[in-house]
């Protein structure tokens, strides 16, 4: 276990309350609740309002569920298969600017997708759901097996579910089931430039 989380400056409580556990209950996720999470992601800011994100998902019990589980790295399959939904976040490398007809490249798609994921995660938390982002995905297979258009990039996987008891996990994963802490502000925010060594 770690020490309790606390903010050094006043912020909205959901920023420190949200975390990424791996144990889920068997509760199912309705299409309406999932769409509320996508609605939050929809309103994320992006460079030139290009909105380069695309979410492809399956809910547990659907015909596509086993395929979506298999697109995770084996380590993540072991616990994420119990989630209520699995979502893959993909980015598109181009967008059509306002007033234009031809696609233009964007070099900030991954950055914008990260913001959209953050909005989704916070919305899920506000609704009592867990959204756990995962880098351990079969990125190449996601592109081909989910039929993504040319140029798309698989960014992350997201497991969504209700928080379950830690006993649902293996002993190895139980040891990792705690709220992680964060670096202090002075380690990453510098006025006027980087500090001299």
Task: Place the predicted regions along the sequence by residue.
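Acidic, surface-exposed loops and disordered segments
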Residues: 1-197
């Amino acid at each position: 276990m770690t020490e309790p989380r606390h903010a050094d400056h006043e912020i909205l409580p959901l920023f420190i309350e949200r975390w990424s556990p791996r144990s889920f209950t068997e509760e199912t996720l309705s299409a309406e609740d999932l769409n509320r999470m996508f609605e939050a992601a929809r309103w994320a800011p992006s460079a030139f309002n290009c909105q380069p994100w695309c979410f492809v998902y399956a809910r547990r019990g659907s015909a596509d569920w086993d395929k979506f589980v298999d697109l995770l790295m084996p380590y993540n399959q072991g616990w994420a298969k119990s989630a209520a939904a699995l979502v893959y976040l993909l980015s598109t490398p181009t967008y059509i600017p306002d007033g234009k007809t031809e696609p233009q490249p964007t070099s900030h798609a991954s950055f914008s997708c990260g913001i959209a994921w953050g909005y989704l995660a916070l919305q899920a938390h506000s609704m009592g759901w867990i959204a756990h982002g995962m880098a351990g995905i079969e990125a190449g297979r996601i592109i081909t097996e989910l039929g993504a258009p040319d140029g798309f990039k698989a960014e992350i996987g997201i497991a969504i579910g209700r928080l379950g008891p830690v006993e649902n996990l293996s002993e190895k994963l139980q040891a990792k089931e705690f709220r992680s802490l964060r670096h202090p502000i002075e380690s990453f925010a510098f006025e006027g430039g980087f500090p001299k060594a």
